[in-house]
């Protein structure tokens, strides 16, 4: 055994043994060999960007610790891995480097896989998938065709968010402050045909399940999904009009529909606002250049509800009027930049007295404000509007003719009934959720399996012709989708209906399609006949999913929808894919910067600067080591290449080892909390592992005596010190086991540190009982450390003979707490005289009251305090204290 801990030798040796033994290959156990059943734990699959970052290390270590612990507990545990391999970064890298995206992607996969293996992760690589592989995306295409058959997938032309730099459609969620989430380009609005999935058909079930069937998810994530789905119950009704188009036909059949959750305020309508794309807006703009210019301006504005809520409210009058359905009054129609055509009917009623947004708009343009709700029975001035609006309490109708005096619900019911009687409205439930547009005008994605025929239009590709394979030789040049001009992609394509020459669809699928079901493919990755089969029945639903909070809405919502579609198609038997969800915290590091010579911001690596502290030790600034000049300290932020505050896991592993990287990321903060990087703490983790190794070396040197004790069957009695060691070890073991169950890995690590401290503080008197206690206790430490630092634990387990006695650590059971070891031979009780603390008294564990009284009365502390005075009364509180009254 090496005297010094050499992490490179230890880790390479362990990994070589695991790979040779195919140690982590898992099968569906139906024999009962795994008494606790199956457990499926999975991290969100990474994008193969080139290198792992510390966020990856933290995520995968959390998963790996859970996996190894549960295997020791008797579970059949699956931990797979794959690659979310389609997407824009590969195209951009191809343009930059002049190589096909496929080559760039597969090179990155190979490198990142080596990094994962260097981390010692217990991944079953036999189940590896890459979403850019035709054997995988064939099933994207197959399910898309099934959705077409069922009417879940459909084609339509709609106003969409267009990123002019990436030349593609963006979902609302991908537009931030009016700009593309990736390029930062100002997003345009365009009418483009594309394919959509009816996720709205599942809105009620998606909402109900996230509210009531996912107790293992963080409340924050469940609330985010609930708000995104956005169920609203209200009334949809029409304002009538006589506005006609150029042909003389009534626009919209003479009705302009709106939806409101506050039908009780309908008598307070003083204007209506429509979206810039609304038919009435476009009709009015045809003869109004100023209005037309305003509509063009709106196209460059925000595209999400959140953005529209915060941007300045602007509008232009159309010169058109519609008729109020209950009063018959004429209501002016405006175009508002805060109205979305994609939500509801693209029109809203304006009730400025009772809606914050309408109030802001009306005040700006001098529109009438009519109060029709009285809160708490009091009349409020318009000047005090903000006070009572913010209260949001239900009130009674006023200034509302026949509805005066009705409470909110009664008023809504009455208004809805009157509108229904006129044939102009009805109660309705609406949803914030919109159908999922899956068409992307990009090359590197799953080809949509559609053929375009001049005679028959869009025709599905026959199932026997799947997969439609994406050409691998394209090198995007920024001039649009190269599939348009790729001759091989369209060569020989004929219409499945008439057999005439045709062309393939060149749009590809949103990459969120790829990540919506990969976790099911892990269960049966090599099946070329079925999308999923018996493996999914065994492993699904997933027991524990691990990933970032940034995926709370899009990925997790789409995955839930995809699962329900697969269920309805008879492919799986589950309603929800993920039983428990853990969203790990971000990894942060310090940020240092100063203005560069050319006016930009120059960022410095933390290793390049020296911190400046105030009297309290707080960092207030820094100076660059090379020139001594001051730099700004910006605090901590997410690690990123652009700010030079990242830490390369490969460098960390080479310098300190994978076990140190794993231990540090688990010890520094609970899994859900942010982790603030600290180089000194990394050193501390490494020192701890050296201490463990050094203790193992000491045990190895004494193994002759230990072997003698083993040969004797460890029948020797434990001495006092050995009993105390075992009591401490098993007490901490009990807590560590509990913390593993809670996935509180920071306290798991601190518990292991307590175990080592107890071992180091133990004085070995050379007796067989002492050797026995040491051998058992260090074995417990190694098994408790194994999920966090598997290489070190594996090496010491083998070197010290545990493997020869108990088998490989891979298959070792979790150590059981010995309840007998927790029992103490003697206990120490607090001694009080006349209620005041005077010392302590030691008695045998389980001593009766008479024995405790006798020991207390004979104690030196009592005799000194009593000074000969007799005891009048002795009060014993079992297990805690003795109080003697004199």
From Swiss-Prot:
It catalyses: tRNA(Leu) + L-leucine + ATP = L-leucyl-tRNA(Leu) + AMP + diphosphate. A motif ('KMSKS' region) lies at residues 638-642. A motif ('HIGH' region) lies at residues 46-56. GO terms for molecular function: aminoacyl-tRNA deacylase activity; ATP binding; leucine-tRNA ligase activity. Pfam families: Anticodon_1, tRNA-synt_1, tRNA-synt_1_2, tRNA-synt_1g. It comes from Polaromonas sp. (strain JS666 / ATCC BAA-500). PROSITE patterns: AA_TRNA_LIGASE_I. Keywords: Aminoacyl-tRNA synthetase, ATP-binding, Cytoplasm, Ligase, Nucleotide-binding, Protein biosynthesis. Transmembrane segments: none annotated. Its EC number is 6.1.1.4. GO terms for cellular component: cytosol. This is Leucine--tRNA ligase. ATP binds at residue 641. One of its GO terms (biological process) is leucyl-tRNA aminoacylation. InterPro entries: aa-tRNA-synth_I_CS, aa-tRNA-synth_Ia, Leu-tRNA-ligase, Leu_tRNA-synth_edit, M/V/L/I-tRNA-synth_anticd-bd, Methionyl/Leucyl_tRNA_Synth, Rossmann-like_a/b/a_fold, tRNAsynth_Ia_anticodon-bd. SUPFAM superfamilies: Anticodon-binding domain of a subclass of class I aminoacyl-tRNA synthetases, Nucleotidylyl transferase, ValRS/IleRS/LeuRS editing domain. Belongs to the class-I aminoacyl-tRNA synthetase family. It is found in: Cytoplasm. Its main location: cytoplasm.
């Amino acid at each position: 055994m090496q005297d010094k801990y050499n992490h490179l030798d230890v880790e390479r040796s362990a990994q070589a043994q695991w790979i040779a033994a195919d140690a982590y290959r898992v099968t569906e156990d139906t024999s009962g060999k795994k008494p606790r059943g199956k457990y499926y734990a999975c991290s969100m699959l990474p994008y193969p960007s080139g290198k792992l970052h510390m966020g990856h290390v933290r995520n995968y270590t959390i998963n790996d610790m859970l996996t190894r612990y549960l295997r020791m507990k008797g579970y059949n545990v699956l931990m797979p891995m794959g690659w979310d391999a389609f997407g824009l970064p590969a195209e951009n890298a191809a343009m930059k480097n002049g190589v096909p995206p496929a080559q760039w992607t597969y090179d990155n996969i190979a490198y990142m896989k080596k990094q994962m293996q260097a981390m010692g992760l217990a991944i079953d690589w036999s189940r590896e998938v890459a979403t850019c592989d035709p054997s995988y995306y064939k099933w994207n295409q197959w399910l898309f065709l099934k959705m077409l058959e069922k009417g879940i997938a459909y084609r339509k032309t709609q106003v969409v968010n267009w990123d002019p730099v990436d030349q593609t459609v963006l979902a609302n969620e991908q537009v931030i402050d009016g700009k593309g989430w990736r390029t930062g380009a100002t997003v345009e609005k365009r009418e483009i045909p594309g394919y959509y999935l009816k996720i709205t058909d599942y809105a009620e079930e998606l909402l109900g399940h996230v509210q009531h069937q996912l107790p293992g998810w963080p409340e924050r994530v469940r609330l985010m999904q609930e708000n995104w789905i956005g169920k609203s119950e209200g009334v949809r009704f029409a304002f009538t009009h006589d506005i006609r188009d150029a042909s003389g036909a009534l626009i919209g059949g003479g009705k302009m529909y709106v939806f409101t959750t506050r039908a009780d305020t309908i008598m307070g309508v003083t204007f209506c606002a429509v979206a810039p794309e609304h038919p009435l807006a476009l009709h009015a703009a045809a003869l109004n250049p100023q209005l037309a210019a305003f509509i063009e301006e709106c196209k460059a504005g925000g595209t999400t509800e959140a953005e529209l809520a915060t941007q300045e409210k602007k509008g232009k009058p159309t010169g058109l009027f519609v008729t109020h359905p209950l009063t018959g009054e004429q209501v002016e129609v405006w175009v508002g930049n805060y109205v979305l055509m994609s939500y509801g009917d693209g029109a809203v009623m304006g009730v400025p007295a009772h809606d914050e947004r309408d109030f802001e708009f009306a005040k700006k343009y001098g529109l009438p404000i009519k109060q029709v709700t009285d809160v708490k029975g009091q009349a409020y001035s318009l000047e005090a509007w903000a006070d009572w609006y913010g209260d949001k309490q239900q009130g009674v109708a006023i200034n509302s003719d026949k509805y005066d005096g009705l409470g909110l619900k009664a008023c809504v019911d009455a208004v809805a009934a009157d509108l229904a009687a006129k044939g102009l409205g009805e109660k309705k439930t609406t949803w914030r959720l919109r159908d999922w547009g899956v068409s992307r005008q990009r090359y590197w994605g799953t080809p949509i399996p559609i053929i375009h025929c001049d005679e028959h239009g869009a025709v599905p590709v026959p199932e026997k012709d799947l997969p439609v394979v994406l050409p691998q030789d394209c090198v995007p040049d920024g001039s649009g989708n190269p599939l348009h001009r790729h001759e091989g992609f369209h060569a020989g394509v004929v219409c499945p209906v008439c057999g005439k020459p045709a062309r393939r669809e060149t749009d590809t699928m949103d990459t969120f399609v790829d990540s919506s079901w990969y976790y099911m493919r892990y269960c049966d990755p090599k099946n070329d006949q079925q999308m999923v089969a018996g493996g999914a029945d065994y492993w699904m639903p997933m027991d524990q999913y691990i990933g970032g909070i940034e995926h709370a809405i899009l990925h997790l919502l789409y995955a839930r929808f995809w699962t329900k579609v697969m269920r309805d198609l008879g492919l799986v038997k589950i309603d929800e894919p993920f039983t428990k969800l853990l969203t790990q915290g971000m990894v942060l590091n310090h940020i240092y910067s100063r203005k560069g010579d050319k006016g930009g911001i120059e960022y410095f690596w933390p290793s390049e600067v020296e911190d400046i502290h105030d009297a309290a030790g707080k960092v207030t600034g820094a100076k660059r080591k090379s020139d001594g000049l001051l730099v700004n300290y910006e605090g901590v932020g997410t690690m990123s290449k652009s700010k030079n505050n990242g830490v390369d896991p490969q460098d960390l592993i080479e310098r300190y080892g994978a076990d140190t990287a794993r231990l540090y990321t688990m010890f520094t903060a609970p899994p859900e909390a942010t982790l603030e990087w600290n180089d000194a703490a990394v050193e501390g983790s490494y020192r701890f592992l050296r201490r463990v190794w050094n203790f193992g070396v000491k045990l190895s040197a004494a193994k002759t005596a230990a072997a003698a004790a083993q040969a004797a069957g460890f029948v020797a009695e434990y001495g006092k010190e050995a009993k105390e060691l075992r009591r401490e070890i098993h007490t901490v073991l009990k807590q560590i086991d509990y913390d593993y169950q809670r996935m509180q890995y920071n306290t798991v690590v601190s518990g292991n540190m307590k175990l080592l401290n107890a071992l180091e503080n133990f004085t070995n008197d050379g007796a067989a009982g002492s050797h026995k206690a040491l051998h058992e206790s260090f074995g417990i430490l190694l098994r408790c450390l194994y999920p966090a630092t598997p290489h070190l634990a594996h090496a010491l387990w083998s070197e010290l003979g545990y493997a020869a006695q108990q088998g490989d650590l891979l298959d070792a059971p979790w150590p059981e707490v010995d309840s007998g070891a927790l029992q103490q031979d003697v206990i120490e009780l607090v001694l009080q005289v006349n209620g005041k603390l005077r010392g302590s008294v030691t008695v045998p564990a389980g001593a009766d009251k008479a024995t405790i009284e006798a020991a207390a009365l004979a104690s030196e502390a009592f005799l000194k305090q009593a000074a000969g005075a007799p005891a009048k009364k002795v009060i014993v509180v079992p297990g805690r204290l003795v109080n003697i009254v004199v």
